[in-house]
C-alpha cells in the first residue's frame, strides 16, 4: 500500500483551542513539567509497543532496544524528545492530537474555575501531556510512524498553538515519535544540558526506559561544555516499584505518582508492598489529594496499570479494584499472570481475584491508619480524604460485602451531637455516646443538611437528648439499605414505622400515647376520610413537640426521600402512600377537633405542611395557596 503524499491544513477541535490557552496561563509557573509530560508519553508509547509485540514480534523491526532520547540545539533554539515506541498513524495523530476524544470533556470544562492553582490541577487530571509543550514553545513539530507501517507512511504534524495545524505524509525510516519544541523568546535557559538533566532526574528518574542524552565535556578551547557522540543514561531506568522501599525517597514516590496519575500534585497517601505466597505480585497504590472531576461517573477511567514481570499490559484494569475504590491510582505487577493476558481472561482469573482482595485489604488498611492516626498530620489527611472521596466510599457498603464492617468504620457523618457541619462523626463515636438502655442507631435522611437539621422527626430526640445521624448525600439511602446494623446495633430511621425508643421511653409516655390515640380516634379517622388516597393512615404521635404533623412510612416501605431521588434520576417509581402523624398538643390540631366549616381545608394544609417540611413537592401548589388565602380571610373576618 502506498502512502498518499498529502499536506493538509486543519483546525483544532474547539476544546483543544480552549485547552491550549489554559495551558499557557495556568501552568507557566510550573513550566518544567513539559519535559516530564513528553517523556511520560514516550514511556507509554514504549509500553504499548512491548505489549503489541508479545503477539507480533515483527513490530520491533529488528530494533528492540527501547529508549527515550532528549536533545537540544542552541542555534536553532529547539528541544527534541524522541522515542522508538509504537508511533502513530496519520489517523491516530488526528484523533489523539487534533481532538480530545474522551468522555468527561464537558465535565472537565464545566469544572474549571478561573483559579490558576485549581485549574492547573484539573488540567493535570485530564491527561493533556502533549499540549504542555506549548507552555515553552511557540511552534511544535511532531514526526511519527506507527510500528508495522512501511517507511513512506510517516507523518509530520506542526502547529503554532493558535488553533490550527498542518499534517503531511513523509518518509520516516525509523518507527516511533519525535517531538521538537521551537522555544518562545525568553526560554533560552532551557537550552542547557545541565538544566535538562536536572529536570529529567527531578521528574522522570522512575521511568523504566533509559532516557539518554549525548554526553557533554568541558572544552578549554571554547570555554564551555561541548556535546560528544557518546550516549549517557540520565535516569536510573529501573522499575521504581521493584526497588527496596528503603532505597526510594519520598520525592521519588511522589514523582512516580504524578507519572501514573497524570496529576500535578503529590498524593495524599500511598502503600507499597510485595506479596509472596501462592501468588507473587507487587503493588504500589496511591490515594490522590483531590478527587478527579469525573469521580461520580462510575464508567470513568480507573487508575490501576497492570504489569506482568515489569512488562506493561494495560491501563484502566478495572478488575484489580472494586468500583468504590476507582479513585486509587498506581500499579500492580504480577509474577504469575501470562504475558498475553486479556481483559476477558482477567474476569475469570483466580489469580486476579486474589490480587484484588489483597489490594483492597492494603487500601483499606492505609485508610484505617489515617483514620486512627493521633497526629495532626494524619487527622488532617483523613479529613481531606473524606471530603474528597467520602461519598464514593459509602458505595462500598453495598458493593463489598466481605469488607462491609471495615468500610463502615471508616464512614463519617454529621450528627445532632454538635452544630458542626463537617462529616466527622464515625459510627463508633456514635455507639460510644449511646445512652444507657439505647439499643438502636438513629438516623434521618433528607436532600440537604439544612432539611435534615430542621426535620420535625428530630423533635422528640432533641427533647430526650438522643443523638441522631443526619444523612443528606444522595448515596445515603443506598448506604442504609445495605447496612442494617453496626456492632450489633440496628440502624433505625426516625421517619419510618411507629416511634420506638425502647427502654428510653418510660411507661407513662406509652400510656399517654395510648390514651391520646383513643381520644383522637374520631379526629384521625375524619382527617383520613378527607385526605383519601393521599395517605395510608392518620394517627397520633408523641414524636413531635413543636410541629403539628409529620409524614412517616412503614418500616419496610420506600422513604419519601428515596422516592424523590429515584424520580429525579428519571426512574419509574411506584408511589408509597405515607402515614400522617399528628401532634395532639399542637394548637392547630386542637382547633381541628372543633372545626366544622373549614375542616377539609385545615386537614389538607396539615398534610401539605408535613410534606413540605420533609422536602417534598406539592402536587397542586395552587390549591394549597388558595386554601391558605381562604383561611386567612375567614380568620380575619371572625376578628
Swiss-Prot record:
CDD domains: HATPase_Hsp90-like
Region (C): 565-639
Location relative to the cell: Cytoplasm
Chain positions covered by the region annotation B: 344-564
Primary localization: cytoplasm
Statement: the UniProt record of this protein carries the keyword Chaperone: yes
Keyword field contains Cytoplasm: yes
Entry-linked InterPro entries: HATPase_C_sf (IPR036890), Heat_shock_protein_90_CS (IPR019805), HSP90_C (IPR037196), Hsp90_fam (IPR001404), Hsp90_N (IPR020575), Ribosomal_Su5_D2-typ_SF (IPR020568)
One family name in Pfam for this protein: HATPase_c_3
Region (A): 1-343
GO molecular function: ATP binding; ATP hydrolysis activity; ATP-dependent protein folding chaperone; unfolded protein binding
Coiled-coil ranges per UniProt: none
Transmembrane segments: none
Keywords, sorted A to Z: ATP-binding, Chaperone, Cytoplasm, Nucleotide-binding, Stress response
Cellular component GO terms, alphabetical: cytoplasm
Job description of the protein: Molecular chaperone. Has ATPase activity.
Quaternary structure and partners: Homodimer.
Similarity comment: family membership: Belongs to the heat shock protein 90 family.
PANTHER family: HEAT SHOCK PROTEIN 90 FAMILY MEMBER
UniProt cross-references to HAMAP family, sorted A to Z: HSP90
Record-given protein name: Chaperone protein HtpG
